[in-house]
């Protein structure tokens, strides 16, 4: 009799519906889910959400060409000192990373997300990629003309449509975040990233940037065919000393406000969801710490 009662209790418990936490309920608003999730997170998990790592496959390929000493000390090729690619799954499962880049296959994206599901809170990963003129880092993707060539068309609708298609192809391979548009103003032809920009005219750059943002995000970026856009690089990387990428910028406040700021103001007005800080110094102050 006791066993029958015990079995009945066990079966009743097993058959009860599993109630997910509010942050796991897709029917709630993002704000409601975040309010529920944040108090559950440790400080380490919160910091982890701000950490972006290079994809495991990318790191593993580079490791084959590096010495033990380089592996131990150097992060110049997308490495992290004393962290081997074989250790990355555990880093994800312990909630110490929130985002990845250089993930170029759906298979790897799915694998990374499975590791994230095994973490304490099961927070999905945000995966970003440089889809500047199509999702061109992915084999088989549609590759469009570079931004400089797109700008020469003066065809905003064409640029928007190209980025709508890019968003679809990104989502098909597991990416959610495109590191574009590059709305730097190209002022020195020696600079190696001129072709990645929409040119030297502040107005045209701003309009092309908005068309790119609209195509990628399509208003609200939520949905299976939309991604997050990223306006970069804030600010003034397009006229570096001697034309060398990442070198300092010495520039007047007037030139910043008249030429370099307007495209970013247009991006904000268009609802861009993210900015990327510039990698250069501006009048002696690193952009990342300005």
Where are these regions (language model features)?
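Glycoside hydrolase catalytic-domain context in secreted enzymes
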Residues: 21-290
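N-terminal signal peptide c-region/cleavage motif recognized by signal peptidases
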Residues: 15-16
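Residue-level detector of intrinsically disordered, flexible termini
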Residues: 7, 19-20
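Sec-dependent signal peptide recognition
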Residues: 2-11
